[in-house]
Amino acid sequence: MRKNNMKLSVLALVILTLIPFTTIKAQDEVEASVGTDVVSSDVWRGQKLGGFSVQPYVGIDYKGFSLSAWGNVGVESTDDKEIDFTLAYSNGGFSLSLTDYWVDYGTGFLHFAAHDTDHVLEAQIGYDFDVLAINWYTNIAGADGVNADGKRAYSSYVSLTAPFSLGGIDWTAEIGATPWANDYYGANGFSVQEISLMAEKEIEITENFSLPIFAKLACNPATEDTFFVFGLSF
């Protein structure tokens, strides 16, 4: 049953992503976006997943519902490629989403068996109070991690983010933690995985074009590792 649920969920996300954009354009209220980030290193939730990377994305939004695809391709041969699909809903500050993460660790994209897959299906729920956003994430299927007893851990992550402006720059402070033991985040119990500060600014190139840049300083107290990431958005 777990295999079938995982397969149906992932295939639904893939099929919806492949809907022709000619059909989408006929609906005036649908908004579409496409772009890419170029980052000095791929850092996620206090973990370095790769070096210099290109991260393209494409998405559509309609009345609070959104469907998006995001990828990561590193320039180093040791970097694993990643493709993620997210189906989400938001209303005011409330948000709910389902994300299929796939990192190419050697098992093909079309492998969905519970113990023979590189897919991870994650559910998210959160609320943005403007001054503070709270988000909870839980892995519900796929290669989602186990606890010390070898049982499914439902590996989870909770994030608190606080945006603010200072000196003409937009800042975001964040702290993220995993609440219980799991090998997905390499935690033996409650563990703070990331404390970070990100700065964002648009540099005006011409009257009609500005280049968004960002820099993020992140620390993982659990591993005593620190990262400084720079990126450009196009």
Language-model regions: role of each:
Residues 197, 203, 223-234:
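Outer-membrane beta-barrel "beta-signal"
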Residues 1-31:
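Cleavable N-terminal export/targeting peptides
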Residues 114-182:
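Detector for outer-membrane/organellar transmembrane beta-barrel domains
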Residues 30, 50-54, 79-83, 92, ...:
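Residues that define the transmembrane beta-barrel architecture of outer-membrane proteins
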Residues 170-205:
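Outer membrane beta-barrel transmembrane domains
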Residues 27-61:
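Outer-membrane beta-barrel initiation region
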